[in-house]
């Protein structure tokens, strides 16, 4: 679908449809008031008859309104004017896209980007409209033999901005929004792919294809089990021992900073392409969803695509730590003691706490890049789901400024994270009688002790950990990957590049 911005009066629009807002209780938005005046009170008369109350998501499609050049006007409820926030704004945009498609509109001019959203500027409103539109149109049917094409006639959407001087900001918002949306889609597609297709080798092939597509800035190298063994990545290797699929770590390097020697931002994604729990076998119910245990790696891949698409003036390294945790005669066991790449030893108490074993070696590996910061992304703990539910990701960090940056980016992007504490007292729960540490710390504070484990491998750089176990996918009827936290990390990198949309 094509997006563009313009600045014009609603009465001058010759379009298949104009989209304007109505507030509760039956209050016209400023643009709707202009149309009402031109139509000699036609719209307000309909509202007085109770045709539309203005609740969030309510719609009323008007045909051939008197004195209006456009064929139709779509009125959409926006709730109470002073309470229109980011979440409601996105709900309104999503409803708009679905309604336009349902009603057969091929193109439309949307004036919702002129609504006042608390604390948000035109750039934010246009960009969120683009990202939300793409989200509303997403489907995953690659593996269906009988593809039913949904009715999506909408081909062009024009966002109106209040003044001509905001056109540049709006155009930039579309560019950024499309790149972020493409990154989200890439992450969702990877996450939704079944584990018999999407194994570590598949992740590696996608990483190589990304380098082929953006060869000017991106190089990819893939580290196999033999090289991991030579590097001493024994914890990572142990997790994949029970699987017939080789563990592979894909390292994607993007160089966009004019200073080629500038220290990179490093993103590390947990890529366990299927997690049975290993010898500590998971319950059978909903085990199919353990294909989503690679959503951390999928999100890093999506972010790297966004970075390359926008040609950001940064150096960024993305690591996809791919493997599969299966039971078998060669699988690692509870009671094993592993020597990590860092030289520290770990007693395995539960083979289903495997993500931290993969990450600890990957986090040691990335020391060689002399990183400015390192951010790992992982569907790491069920404890984080219990703590924060399915709406907000967990954030833990050894560096306050980095944590504050990420929280700020999460608020900007509408991809929220919440910082959890990581006090030294929690480290005591990881004590082992037989090794430097255990790989679990018991049930209390499980998301925190998992991060405390990782913190022992990140002492040489500023680091943050995003636990997306509750936010990376949805269960139930709407089952599927969400693409989070691509939007959060994209915003973080846009901010670092000085492209945060502030006018």
From Swiss-Prot:
UniProt keyword annotations, A-Z: Aminopeptidase, Cytoplasm, Hydrolase, Manganese, Metal-binding, Protease
SUPFAM superfamilies in the record: Macro domain-like, Zn-dependent exopeptidases
Cofactor(s) essential for the protein: Mn(2+)
GO molecular function ontology, one term from the record: manganese ion binding
Recorded catalytic activity of this chain's protein: Release of an N-terminal amino acid, Xaa-|-Yaa-, in which Xaa is preferably Leu, but may be other amino acids including Pro although not Arg or Lys, and Yaa may be Pro. Amino acid amides and methyl esters are also readily hydrolyzed, but rates on arylamides are exceedingly low; Release of an N-terminal amino acid, preferentially leucine, but not glutamic or aspartic acids
Subcellular location per the Swiss-Prot or TrEMBL entry: Cytoplasm
One CC-aspect GO term: cytoplasm
Binding site for Mn(2+) 1: 275, 352, 354
GO BP of this protein: proteolysis
Domain of life: Bacteria
Keyword Hydrolase: yes
Location of the active site: 282, 356
Transmembrane segment boundaries: none
Ranges in a coiled coil: none
Entry EC no(s): 3.4.11.1, 3.4.11.10
Cofactor note (record): Binds 2 manganese ions per subunit.
Classification via CDD domains: Peptidase_M17
Enzyme class: hydrolase
Record NCBIfam families: PRK00913.1-1 (NF002072), PRK00913.1-2 (NF002073), PRK00913.1-4 (NF002074)
Family under the similarity heading: Belongs to the peptidase M17 family.
Known role: Presumably involved in the processing and regular turnover of intracellular proteins. Catalyzes the removal of unsubstituted N-terminal amino acids from various peptides.
This protein's name: Probable cytosol aminopeptidase
Organism the protein comes from: Erwinia tasmaniensis (strain DSM 17950 / CFBP 7177 / CIP 109463 / NCPPB 4357 / Et1/99)
């Amino acid at each position: 679908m094509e997006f563009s911005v313009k600045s014009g009066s609603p009465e001058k629009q010759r379009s298949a449809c104009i989209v304007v807002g109505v507030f509760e209780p039956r209050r016209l938005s400023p643009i709707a008031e202009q149309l009402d005046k031109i139509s000699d009170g036609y719209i307000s008369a309909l509202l007085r008859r109770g045709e539309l109350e203005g609740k969030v998501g309510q719609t009323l499609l008007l045909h051939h309104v008197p004195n209006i050049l456009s064929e139709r006007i779509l009125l959409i409820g926006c709730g109470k004017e002073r309470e229109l926030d980011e979440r409601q704004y996105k709900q309104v945009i999503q409803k708009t896209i679905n309604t336009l498609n349902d009603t057969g509109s091929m193109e439309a001019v949307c004036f919702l980007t002129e609504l006042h959203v608390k604390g948000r500027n035109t750039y934010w409103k246009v960009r969120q409209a683009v990202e939300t539109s793409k989200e509303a149109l997403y489907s995953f049917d690659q593996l269906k033999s009988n593809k039913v094409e949904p009715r999506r006639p909408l081909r062009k959407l024009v966002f109106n901005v209040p003044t001509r001087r905001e056109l540049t900001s709006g155009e930039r918002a579309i560019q950024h929004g499309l790149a972020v949306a493409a990154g989200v889609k890439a992450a969702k597609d990877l996450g939704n792919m079944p584990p018999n297709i999407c194994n570590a080798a598949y992740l590696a092939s996608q990483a190589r294809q990304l380098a082929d597509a953006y060869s000017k800035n991106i190089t990819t190298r893939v580290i196999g089990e033999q090289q991991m063994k030579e590097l001493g990545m024994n914890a990572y290797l142990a997790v994949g021992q029970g699987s017939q699929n080789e563990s592979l770590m894909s390292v994607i390097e993007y160089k966009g900073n004019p200073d080629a020697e500038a220290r990179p931002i490093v993103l590390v994604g947990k890529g366990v392409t299927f997690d049975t729990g290993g010898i500590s076998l998971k319950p059978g119910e909903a085990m199919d969803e353990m294909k989503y245990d690679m959503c951390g790696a999928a999100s890093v891949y999506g972010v790297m695509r966004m970075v390359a698409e926008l040609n950001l003036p940064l150096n960024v390294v993305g690591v996809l730590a791919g493997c599969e945790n299966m039971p078998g005669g060669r699988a690692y066991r509870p009671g094993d003691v592993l020597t990590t790449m860092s030289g520290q030893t770990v007693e395995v108490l539960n083979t289903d706490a495997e993500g931290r074993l993969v990450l600890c070696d990957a986090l040691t590996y990335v020391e060689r890049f002399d990183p400015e910061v390192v951010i790992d992304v992982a569907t790491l703990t069920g404890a984080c789901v219990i703590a924060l539910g399915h709406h907000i990701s967990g954030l833990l960090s050894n560096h306050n400024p980095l944590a504050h940056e990420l929280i700020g980016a999460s608020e900007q992007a509408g991809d929220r994270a919440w910082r959890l504490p990581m006090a030294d007292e929690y480290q005591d729960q990881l004590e082992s009688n037989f090794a430097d540490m255990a790989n679990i710390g018991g049930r209390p504070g499980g998301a925190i002790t998992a991060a405390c484990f990782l913190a022992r491998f990140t002492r040489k750089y500023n680091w943050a950990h995003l636990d997306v176990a509750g936010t990376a996918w949805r269960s139930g009827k709407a089952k599927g990957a969400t693409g989070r936290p691509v939007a959060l990390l994209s915003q973080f990198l846009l901010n670092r590049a000085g492209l945060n949309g502030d006018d």
